[in-house]
């Protein structure tokens, strides 16, 4: 991997010393939601090192929640640019507020459904199975939306189609994925965290 690592110390980087410290950025958030739905810092670091192995790449987090992956990745691997897309407006607001607190410039957050995003605008992708709440209703984060297995199938098919349109060499990091959304021409090139974190490259 290249040397796309911190060349200077971010004065607010103490937030990334532990998951507990980071979660204090969101004092009103439910701690159980943090543990179940947000990317652990150690996972974010490993995924960022894989996705941002080259400088100036654009990385999209699909279903970014409060922005934990994007913020952590932007801190650990600052020579890439990170975008999070999230359909819950309240979480996007929290992500933007957290970004301001930690003082990172190489990250932004969008409010919307990933279906509206042009994957051509991004080089590599991170996915912590944000569709699964449509597959297992016990995993619902809240009652803001309707959930169904039909939506799960629709989203996984759409993501597979979008990923399939990307060129050879495209990288994807998945965490706790069912792999239904992975095109056949993406191959696993590495795993971490007892195989829950997988690294893929399109051949």
Predicted regions mapped to residue ranges:
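S-adenosyl-L-methionine
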Residues: 1-54
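Conserved class I S-adenosyl-L-methionine
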Residues: 56-65
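Conserved SAM-binding loop of SAM-dependent methyltransferases across substrates and taxa
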Residues: 68-79
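Conserved SAM-binding motif I beta-strand of class I
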Residues: 81-86
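Conserved SAM-binding loop
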Residues: 95
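Conserved SAM-binding strand-loop segment of SAM-dependent methyltransferases
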Residues: 103-112
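Short conserved loop adjoining the S-adenosyl-L-methionine
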Residues: 116-120
């Amino acid at each position: 991997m290249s040397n796309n690592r911190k060349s200077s110390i971010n004065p607010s980087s103490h937030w990334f010393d532990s998951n507990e410290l980071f979660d204090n950025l969101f004092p009103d958030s439910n701690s159980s939601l943090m543990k179940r739905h947000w990317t652990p810092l150690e996972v974010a670091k490993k995924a960022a090192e894989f996705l941002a192995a080259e400088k100036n790449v654009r990385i999209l987090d699909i279903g970014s929640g409060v922005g934990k992956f994007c913020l952590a990745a932007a801190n650990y691997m600052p020579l890439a640019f990170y975008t999070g897309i999230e359909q819950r407006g309240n979480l996007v607001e929290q992500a933007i507020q957290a970004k301001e607190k930690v003082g990172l410039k190489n990250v932004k957050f969008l409010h919307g459904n990933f279906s509206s995003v042009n994957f051509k605008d991004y080089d590599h992708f991170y996915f912590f199975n944000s569709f699964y709440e449509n597959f297992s209703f016990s995993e619902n984060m809240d009652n803001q939306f309707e959930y169904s297995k039909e939506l799960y199938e629709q989203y996984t098919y759409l993501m597979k189609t979008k990923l399939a349109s990307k060129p050879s060499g495209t990288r994807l990091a998945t965490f706790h994925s069912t792999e239904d959304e992975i095109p056949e021409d993406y191959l696993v090139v590495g795993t971490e965290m007892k195989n829950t974190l997988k690294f893929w490259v399109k051949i």
